[in-house]
A protein has these predicted regions:
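Flexible, low-complexity segments enriched in proline/glycine/serine and punctuated by aromatic residues
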Residues: 13, 34-43, 47-141
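Aliphatic-rich helix starts adjacent to a transmembrane/signal segment
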Residues: 2, 6-49
Length: 141
């Protein structure tokens, strides 16, 4: 009976260790959610890019009209089928990836079309390559 309160100290230390472990689990969950969102956005960009490539293949005779002549971040109310397809592509990109920084470029058509999509992926965090993100796809029409 010479030592009293030792059990209380042991319980306090175990609660501290448990608390640190739970904070680590919460941090890992947060990183997984950010990575999942970044992966979702990348998948949506690839699907939208494949859709515009298929639209170009369907309108092969006018594939040269799909060239954007630079970065497109807004729709231009195209008057041709190619212009409407590009406007729909930009609209779908901006709808699936929120933020005003989502832009697309199409160059090199009708031969080797290079489709570039840029967007802000800052939610992914700097440690996962956040901020500006670019996916470049080359396709032969």
């Amino acid at each position: 009976r010479a030592v009293t309160g030792m059990s209380l100290i042991e319980v306090m230390v175990s609660v501290l260790v448990l608390g640190i472990g739970l904070l680590g689990i919460a941090a890992m969950q947060s990183m997984a959610l950010r990575g999942g969102q970044s992966s979702l956005e990348s998948s949506q960009v690839v699907m939208a890019t494949n859709a515009i490539i298929e639209a170009m293949r369907a309108n092969r005779a006018n594939a040269a009209n799909y060239n954007t002549g630079g970065k497109r971040c807004a729709v231009t109310n195209g008057t041709t089928l190619a212009g409407n397809d590009v406007d729909n592509w930009i609209t779908s990109l901006q709808a699936s990836i929120p933020g005003a920084t989502t832009c697309g470029t199409i160059a090199g058509c009708p031969n080797a079309c290079v489709i570039t999509v840029e967007w802000d992926d800052s939610r992914a965090g700097a440690d996962q390559g956040g901020a500006a993100r670019t996916i470049v796809t080359e396709a032969r029409i």
